[in-house]
Curated annotation (Swiss-Prot):
Residues engaged in binding Mg(2+): 42, 229
Protein name according to UniProt: Isoprenyl transferase 1
Organism: Streptomyces coelicolor (strain ATCC BAA-471 / A3(2) / M145)
Entry cofactors: Mg(2+)
GO biological process, one term: polyprenol biosynthetic process
Subunit structure: Homodimer.
Amino acid sequence: MAVRGILGRQRREYRTPEPHPSGARPPKLGDLVPEHVAIVMDGNGRWAKERGLPRTEGHKVGAEQVMDVLQGAIEMGVGNISLYAFSTENWKRSPEEVRFLMNFNRDFIRKSRDTLDELGVRVRWAGRMPRLWKSVAKELQVAQEQTKDNDRLTLYFCMNYGGRAEIADAAQALAEDVRAGKLDPAKVNEKTLAKYLYYPDMPDVDLFLRPSGEQRTSNYLLWQSAYAEMVFQDVLWPDFDRRDLWRACLEFASRDRRFGGAIPNEELLAMEGRSTR
């Protein structure tokens, strides 16, 4: 069954996600579905090494999982997915791997944008322009323009991105407005700075998901992940599919999110009562 979305004043039909080959269906979480899931696609190199293959093969297989995960997110009802495709630190890798990743990401975006558009995915690129290959930036801009009116799922494709870099860029832009007399420094607060981020309307991250067994943020969406629930899985990204995303969403739904607030006194008393029995 196709879903209708809005394109200008007209309505269009979005393509129904293809079911998983196993026949698995997403769990029903109702209001507990995370609105924004940030994913660190980690483990491509280790996956390839375990099989005696070059690192590039891990990246190729890992890319095949992206579309499956996005379709699983649509089935689940997730509104926003952020994918860490290439970080500002990845330039430290060998010239051969950097060249491969630039070419690969450019080709992936070009080949995928029509399918993403049909699925109702809005593509947004987050990252720095300097150093990024012009051919990659062009494909990202074309994908953004083609999908800008889609409203089923927003995909933030983080390319040449770093969390500290984003905050530094925001601070620089804010400082320039202060110097130009457009902004009173005495009135600067968190909300003010947030307006200078790459996408001020990006929802805060609810679920920060990292496969591969590593347990760190790797400088990813630092501002937006202030109160994110962290879920780390041992599966390597090339073996990751929508079922792993669903399992992470189930884990998220079981968490007690207080956003820095205290546990109510009655809950504390109940916990103390249980601990003394």
